[in-house]
UniProtKB/Swiss-Prot annotation:
Signal sequence coordinates: none
Official protein name in the record: Trypsin inhibitor BvTI
Organism: Bauhinia variegata
Species classification: Eukaryota, Viridiplantae, Streptophyta, Embryophyta, Tracheophyta
InterPro entries tied to this protein: Kunitz_inhibitor_STI-like_sf, Prot_inh_Kunz-lg
Residue(s) at site: Reactive bond for factor Xa: R65, S66
PANTHER family in the record: KUNITZ TRYPSIN INHIBITOR 2, TRYPSIN INHIBITOR A
Pfam families, A to Z: Kunitz_legume
Sorted UniProt keywords: Disulfide bond, Protease inhibitor, Secreted, Serine protease inhibitor
Domain of life: Eukaryota
CDD domains hit by this protein: beta-trefoil_STI_LlTI-like
GO cellular component terms, A-Z: extracellular region
Annotated SUPFAM superfamilies: STI-like
Subcellular location: Secreted
Bridged cysteine pairs (disulfide): C41-C84, C131-C138
């Protein structure tokens, strides 16, 4: 299965960029970054509180040299407009996170951390998954609201966040 964007076009491997937006409006916007706890830079992946925000654009990359992304492949995800964070700023789940299973950005221990997979749920709806580095098992990512009201992207065994991929056009209003 090939990953498609909201226009029905192929999501390009190491291309785009794309916004990751919720499949259903009403509970927040696209995925973005915020500062949590003692972070000096925004390093925590969250869902924007406003459903009118598409969040920050990402590039999705897979190791096979292909123009497209297959839903069976492990991928890296990185924000392209993340400020004050060392590049490359891959999504990853650090072992020492204050919230278990919370998705963060920053330099990873691995040069190209293939920690995530995107699985089709319906025709143009997908779910994000975090995959173990030691096995083939992957677990859903969903939203958990922390004590500060942040809608954090975390590993969840139920209620995965259902998403779509929207081209980040330079002339876009949002």
């Amino acid at each position: 299965d090939t990953l498609l964007d909201t226009d029905g076009e192929v999501v390009r491997n190491n291309g785009g960029p794309y916004y990751i937006i919720p499949a259903f409006r009403g509970n927040g916007g696209g995925l973005t970054l915020t500062r949590v706890g003692s972070e000096t830079c925004p390093r925590t992946v969250v869902q924007a509180s406003s459903e009118h925000s598409d969040g920050l654009p990402v590039v999705i990359s897979a190791l096979p040299r292909s123009l497209f992304i297959s839903t069976s492949w492990r991928v890296t995800i990185q924000f392209v407009e993340a400020t004050c964070i060392p590049k490359p700023s891959f999504w990853h789940i650090p072992q020492d996170s204050e919230l278990e299973g919370a998705v963060k950005v920053g330099a990873s221990d691995e040069r190209f951390p293939l920690e995530f997979r995107i699985e089709r749920v319906s025709e143009d709806t997908y779910k994000l998954m975090h995959c173990s580095s030691t096995s083939d098992s992957c677990r859903d990512l969903g939203i958990s609201i922390d004590e500060e009201g942040n809608r954090r992207l975390v590993v969840r065994d139920e209620n995965p966040l259902l998403v779509r991929f929207k081209k980040a056009n330079q002339d876009s209003e949002k």
